[in-house]
Amino acid sequence: MMERFEKIEMKIPAKAEYVAIIRLTMAGVANRMGFAYDDIEDMKIAISEACTNIVQHAYKEDVGEIAIVFGLYEDRLEIMVADNGVSFDFNNLKRKVGPYDISKPVEHLPENGLGLYLINTLMDDIQIMHDEGMTVLMTKYIQREQVENDGNPISTYESY
């Protein structure tokens, strides 16, 4: 049996000025689903990076589109960001970027691929498919234990 979910689809021009629309939409969806503030902030960075990569690299001089699909599940949000532009080899780029070395100053981090490194760090799962264009599928699980009651009621009254 297929898992039930709701789907929200959007298309925007692959221009920097439209990335904020996607970021705000995602934040609204995640808030409604019950995500914690920090998780929403992480997802805002991740979706901004995915869209910005498309704006900067996918279409060269042409202006294409970015397709975004939000899959709303009971326990997670899946975000698909896709383009039909120029593709690249994610695994090769990932090897070049490598793990973050805390001893290196920020100025010495490689610029290419840092966005994908951030996405990989901030999301629970990331899958990248590249045939004609690029599709990034990012998943973030709702951490319900952050908002559940721990069984210790808090009182505003002082005990004497």
Curated annotation (Swiss-Prot):
Molecular function terms from GO: ATP binding; protein serine kinase activity; protein serine/threonine kinase activity; sigma factor antagonist activity
Highest taxon in the source lineage: Bacteria
EC number(s) on file: 2.7.11.1
Keywords: ATP-binding, Kinase, Nucleotide-binding, Serine/threonine-protein kinase, Transferase
InterPro entries according to UniProt: Anti-sigma-factor_SerPK (IPR050267), HATPase_C_sf (IPR036890), RsbW (IPR010193)
Record field: catalytic activity: L-seryl-[protein] + ATP = O-phospho-L-seryl-[protein] + ADP + H(+); L-threonyl-[protein] + ATP = O-phospho-L-threonyl-[protein] + ADP + H(+)
Keyword ATP-binding: yes
Transmembrane regions: none
Job of this protein: Negative regulator of sigma-B activity. Phosphorylates and inactivates its specific antagonist protein, RsbV. Upon phosphorylation of RsbV, RsbW is released and binds to sigma-B, thereby blocking its ability to form an RNA polymerase holoenzyme (E-sigma-B).
Family of this protein: Belongs to the anti-sigma-factor family.
HAMAP family attached to this UniProt entry: Anti_sigma_B
Name assigned to this protein: Serine-protein kinase RsbW
